[in-house]
From Swiss-Prot:
Domain of life: Eukaryota
Glycan attachment sites: 146, 346
Localisation per UniProt entry: Membrane
Pfam family, one: p450
Binding site for heme: 454
Alphabetically ordered keywords of this record: Glycoprotein, Heme, Iron, Membrane, Metal-binding, Monooxygenase, Oxidoreductase, Transmembrane, Transmembrane helix
Name of the featured protein: Cytochrome P450 monooxygenase tropD
Organism listed in the record: Talaromyces stipitatus (strain ATCC 10500 / CBS 375.48 / QM 6759 / NRRL 1006)
Major subcellular site: membrane
Role played: Cytochrome P450 monooxygenase; part of the gene cluster that mediates the biosynthesis of the tropolone class of fungal maleic anhydrides. The pathway begins with the synthesis of 3-methylorcinaldehyde by the non-reducing polyketide synthase (PKS) tropA. 3-methylorcinaldehyde is the substrate for the FAD-dependent monooxygenase tropB to yield a dearomatized hydroxycyclohexadione. The 2-oxoglutarate-dependent dioxygenase tropC then performs the oxidative ring expansion to provide the first tropolone metabolite stipitaldehyde.
Pathway(s): Secondary metabolite biosynthesis
Length: 514
């Protein structure tokens, strides 16, 4: 009798296991079946771990591009994920109206705190109402007219990099990694704009306090699990994981919170805080003032706004600067052409004025081409297809499918940017009539598109248009070993090893040494 009962219980346990397995397989088949008409690699249609493995190679952008070349404009990247490559679909996936909301892909980009969990910001907020609450109070601070008020602060940092390049490298022809110094510049500008102080990256010629490394490690950790966001919660964003090993985001949060606490202390001790700093306000001042003026804005919004400046405000801009200089130096014809335009426009030396460089046609084309060939972000910007589904490039995408487009892939779409879309050629932005130019402009996905377009777009362009003319006018720069230049995709493009030599250009010099 006991033996029979044991057999019955065992059979019951086995039945439950079998039922669970069958249910899981049925669910997976249903997920696979609903997108069976979308072409793509078989393995990717079965599990998200395939596209996660692409990210681990640090060449996901190239894999994505090859898949679109093989399968077309609509490719299945995951069991429930579809990638689009045609710029004509941008307005459908990323409209100005409400419709396609963000998914958990963005959650790994939120720094974790034990008290508040993973803090969302303007970019990583999934809920549209929360996004607008975060964005609306500070959006005007990022307008081009307001950003240009920071020119005097950027000029201070330009003076520092000018002095350091002269003293360390130009005077004796030492070979150095230009990418490091461009990143130092971008971070010190971010520090000046956000906190009214530089952090000494340029003066010391190194990653002060390991902040750049912390940001890099944070992105390196986040990128793979963005393909499987549930892993982020299991591995990193919980109290147990955080107590065993602090995440790189913890160091970034510590840096930001310390800066905020210091400034808020000054604000609480000075009733006329806003008046005392009027005319000298940095972003952090404006964030604190904005929050204090509106009781409906919670204090943690200040942290969310500030962390956005630190995470995206230096790395993304640094990527554009590195891309621009690498391509100018490896394509000397374009460097000559840019230099000639700057000289003809009588741009000031050593520090160009924004009023002199903001509307130069060839400089504009150079910056646009840099944004096109190597956008700072190089994974698809994911959204959720709404009820009713979508028709894109002749394919029906059912509701609740995750859909997205990679800036790297879209920006190299040959029907839009020409058969030479793989090449650096700034002139493409100056060619064609109004309709052709508008098509190219509208197809550029570097800053995103629609209602969730990057808030810091104008800051990035402002910094790049200040720095690149400064370097081109004041220095003869020669690349030493172009083959050592390395670009790796860790959500942000990581660029390194742009080995160069520089010498000071005489004031009367008008020809670049190329």
């Amino acid at each position: 009798m006991a033996y029979g009962s044991q057999l019955t219980l065992l059979s019951g346990g086995q039945s439950i296991i079998i039922l669970l397995i069958v249910s899981f397989l049925a669910w997976r088949f249903r997920v696979w079946f609903r997108l069976r008409h979308i072409p793509g690699p078989l393995g990717a249609s079965l599990t998200n771990f395939v596209r996660m493995s692409w990210v681990f190679t640090k060449k996901a952008h190239l894999i994505h591009q090859e898949l679109h070349q093989k399968y077309g404009d609509v490719v299945r990247f995951g069991p429930n994920m579809v990638s689009i490559s045609d710029p004509a679909s941008i307005h459908i996936i990323y409209p100005m109206r409400k419709g396609l909301v963000k998914n958990d892909f963005y959650v790994p980009l939120r720094p974790y705190t034990r008290n508040r969990g993973a803090i969302p910001n303007v970019f990583t907020a999934l809920d549209e109402d929360l996004h607008m609450k975060l964005k609306y109070p500070v959006a005007s601070l990022f307008s081009l007219s307001n950003v240009s008020k920071f020119e005097v602060l950027v000029d201070e940092v330009l003076s520092v990099i000018d002095e350091q390049l002269d003293r360390r490298f130009a005077s004796h022809g030492e070979i150095f990694d230009l990418t490091e110094w461009l990143q130092f510049f971008a971070f010190d500008v971010m520090g000046t704009m956000t906190f009214s102080k530089r952090y000494g990256f340029l003066e010391e010629g190194k990653d002060v306090g390991g902040m750049l490394n912390a940001i890099g490690q944070f992105m390196k950790q986040a990128a793979p699990v963005m393909q499987n966001p549930w892993l982020d919660r299991v591995l990193y964003k919980n109290r147990i994981a955080d107590s065993l090993k602090r995440t790189p985001g913890s160091d970034i949060m510590k840096f930001v919170v310390a800066a905020i606490n210091e400034r808020q202390k000054s604000a609480s001790e000075d009733e006329d805080f806003t008046k005392a700093r009027k005319g000298k306000n940095d972003f952090l001042d404006e964030y604190i003032i904005t929050q204090k003026k509106d009781s409906n804005i919670p204090p943690w919004f200040v942290t969310a706004w500030t962390i956005s400046n630190v995470l995206a405000g230096s790395d993304s801009v640094g990527t554009v600067m590195k891309t621009t200089m690498y391509n100018l130096l490896t394509n000397p014809r374009t460097l000559e052409k840019l230099h000639a335009e700057l000289v003809a426009a009588n741009v000031s030396r050593p520090r160009p004025r924004w009023s002199e460089v903001h509307n130069l046609p060839y400089l504009d084309a150079v910056v646009q081409e840099a944004l096109r060939v190597h956008p700072p972000f190089a994974l698809p910007f994911e959204r959720i297809v709404p009820e009713g589904g979508l028709h894109i490039s002749g394919q029906y995408i059912p509701a609740n499918t995750v859909i997205g487009a990679s800036p790297y892939v879209v920006n190299r779409h040959k029907p839009t940017y020409g058969d030479d879309a793989e090449l650096w050629r700034p002139e493409r932005w100056l060619e064609g009539g109004p309709e052709v130019r508008k098509k190219r402009d509208d197809g550029l996905l570097t800053f995103g598109a629609g209602r969730r377009i990057c808030l810091g777009k104008h800051i990035g362009i402002f910094e790049v248009k200040k720095l690149i003319p400064f370097l081109v006018l004041n220095y003869d720069i020669s690349i030493v070993k172009p083959e050592t230049f390395l670009a790796e995709n860790e959500w942000f493009f990581r660029q390194s090893n742009l080995l160069a030599q520089i010498r000071r250009r005489p004031l009367e010099s008008v020809e670049p040494n190329v």
